[in-house]
Amino acid sequence: MQLYTYLYLLVPLVTFHLILGTGTLDHGGALTERRSTDAIALKPEPVLLQKSSARSTDDNGNDRLTQMKRILKKRGNKARGEEEVAKMAAELAREDAVNGK
């Protein structure tokens, strides 16, 4: 009978402690505040990329985007189109066939 008396007194105390410990009844209805805080905490932060990490580099460690800009500036911004590249590849293939490579 003594065990039931202790449990009768202990269970409400433990329950009340757990409720206050989780913050569901703390400050009068903090359950919604806590959920919104958790939602904000779980929201991913934006990734801020630095220029050096966002751009790829070649084998020499040079920035490819910067190199391409320099090349285009030297050409006078006359970038080769796909047709010009295809013609150049066909000419190189013919030269290789003629030279016996």
From Swiss-Prot:
Residues engaged in binding a divalent metal cation: E91, E95
One term under GO cellular component: extracellular region
Cofactor(s) of this protein: Ca(2+); Mg(2+)
Keywords: Amidation, Calcium, Gamma-carboxyglutamic acid, Ion channel impairing toxin, Ionotropic glutamate receptor inhibitor, Magnesium, Metal-binding, Neurotoxin, Postsynaptic neurotoxin, Secreted, Signal, Toxin
Recorded GO MF terms: ion channel regulator activity; metal ion binding; toxin activity
Modified residues (Asparagine amide): N99
Claim: Calcium is one of the keywords in the record: yes
Co-factor note (free text): Divalent cations stabilize the toxin the in alpha-helix conformation.
Modified residues (4-carboxyglutamate): E83, E84, E91, E95
Subcellular location: Secreted
Tissue specificity annotation: Expressed by the venom duct.
Origin superkingdom: Eukaryota
Claim: Secreted is one of the keywords in the record: yes
Signal peptide: 1-21
Prosegment residue ranges: 22-80
Main localization (coarse): secreted
Misc. comment: The mature peptide does not contain cysteine residue. Stabilized by divalent cations. Calcium or magnesium.
Role, per record: Conantokins inhibit N-methyl-D-aspartate (NMDA) receptors. This toxin is far less potent as an anticonvulsant compound than conantokin-R. It induces sleep-like symptoms in mice.
Family note: Belongs to the conotoxin B superfamily.
Protein's recorded name: Conantokin-L
